[in-house]
Structure formats: structure tokens, C-alpha cells
Design a protein with these regions (language model features):
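Cleavable N-terminal export/targeting peptides
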Residues: 1-28
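Gram-negative outer-membrane beta-barrel domains
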Residues: 20-217
């Protein structure tokens, strides 16, 4: 996770030094597409039939793509605003198996979305810094003798840069973190399956670095 954070800071610093022109044209509705290097960390515990509690932490990294649609103000003043919606298609699945197939389960997270607002500080007519606050969601699907814990909900905080590239294009770099609400799943109690007194809880967190290319209409 420390290596990912170091890489994210380096990416943002490099793009923050980029120069371009015609930033005064960069305002209005935009569309962008990009990719992120993402690290996922999950703290959780397992409470079994005997009341024994096991705690643990797992982590994983991935590269994912996304697209976004939004609106930003121009750089005619020293401050501005960026409003938008991000969609991250795809899915990630975790499987848990045992000697008894009746207790095998899988947990899938897919199609992440985010609504965000980002106040901007316009450093020059070509570049801006911003702080972003977002509301994030993701679909959750489970299979096996376990109840669905419900979809993931969380909040995102990030900082980044916007640098114009020609009259209608721009490059966005961003580093941020998302904290999701705690989720909890219990067994269904099917005969030979997972008992209703078995509970698993987890608190997912992500850290990411993003590069995106956008087009202002």
C-alpha cells in the first residue's frame, strides 16, 4: 500500500508541472475516460457458531478503467467548481471454499459509481488544483448459503490537477481514498449449510491514483 501511495504522489507531481494553452476555453460540459491504479484494504472479523471471533485484514491491488461526465466552470476567476458523475464498469469476485461444498460462498462487487463536487483553485489560465468530495456506491452480489449484506456505500476525498491541452482537451490527475460503510453478512441456516449464528463483518477502504483524458464540448 505504501508503494501505491508513493506512485500516486509522483504521478500527480509530474502532471502538475505540465504546461499547456487555451485553458480559458475549458469550461462547460465534459466527458472523460481514464484509468486508475487502486489498492483495496478490508478489515473484518468472523463470528462462528461457538461465538469465537477471528479478526483479519486483506489487501489487493488492481488497474481499472472508468468514464465520467460533468460540468466545470472556466478559469476567468481565481476559483471555480467541478461537478460530475463517474462510472467504473466491471467486477471483482472473492471466493471462499471448504471441504464441504454446501458452505462455499462468493462475494462480487461490480459497477461502481460516484457523484462528486470539487472546488478548484485556478493557479494559471492553463492549470488548476482541486479538492474533491464524492459519494460512492457499488453493487454487491453473493452466492451460497449466505444473506446479501446490501450494496456498498461510502465517501471519497481526493486532490488533483487539471491541465488544458489545446482548445478542448485536458488531462486530469488525481489521488484519493474511499471509505465504505461497514457491511455484515449472516448465514441462511440451510440444512448442512451455514448457520444463522455465523456472522462476517468487514470495512472496505480503497486508495487510488488516476490519470484521465477529457474533452470539453
Amino acid at each position: 500500500m505504501n508503494n501505491i501511495k508513493t506512485m500516486l504522489c509522483t504521478i500527480v507531481a509530474l502532471f502538475g508541472l505540465t504546461t499547456a494553452t487555451n485553458a480559458n476555453m475549458l469550461n462547460g460540459v465534459y466527458f472523460e475516460i481514464g484509468g486508475s491504479a487502486t489498492g483495496v484494504e478490508m478489515d473484518g472479523n468472523h463470528n462462528d457458531n461457538d461465538g469465537d471471533v477471528s479478526n483479519g485484514t486483506i489487501g489487493k491491488t488492481a488497474v481499472v478503467g472508468h468514464y465520467a461526465l460533468g460540468y466545470m466552470t472556466d478559469r476567468s476567476s481565481s476559483v471555480g467548481i467541478d461537478l460530475g458523475y463517474i462510472m467504473t464498469p466491471g467486477e471483482a469476485k472473492i471466493n471462499a471454499t471448504s471441504d464441504d461444498s454446501a458452505t462455499d460462498v462468493s462475494f462480487e462487487v461490480s459497477d461502481g459509481t460516484e457523484y462528486y463536487i470539487a472546488p478548484m483553485i485556478n493557479i494559471t489560465e492553463d492549470a488548476s488544483l482541486y479538492f474533491k468530495y464524492g459519494w460512492s456506491e457499488a453493487d454487491v452480489t453473493v452466492t451460497g448459503d449466505i444473506n446479501n449484506p446490501g450494496d456498498l456505500d461510502g465517501t471519497t476525498v481526493a486532490f488533483g490537477t487539471l491541465v488544458s491541452w489545446g482548445s478542448n482537451l485536458y488531462i486530469r490527475t488525481e489521488a484519493g481514498m474511499t471509505d465504505f460503510d461497514k457491511i455484515s453478512a449472516t448465514g441462511k441456516g440451510t440444512t448442512g449449510g451455514i448457520g444463522t449464528d455465523v456472522t462476517v463483518t468487514a470495512t472496505p477502504k480503497t486508495a487510488y491514483g488516476k490519470i484521465a483524458l477529457g474533452y470539453k464540448f
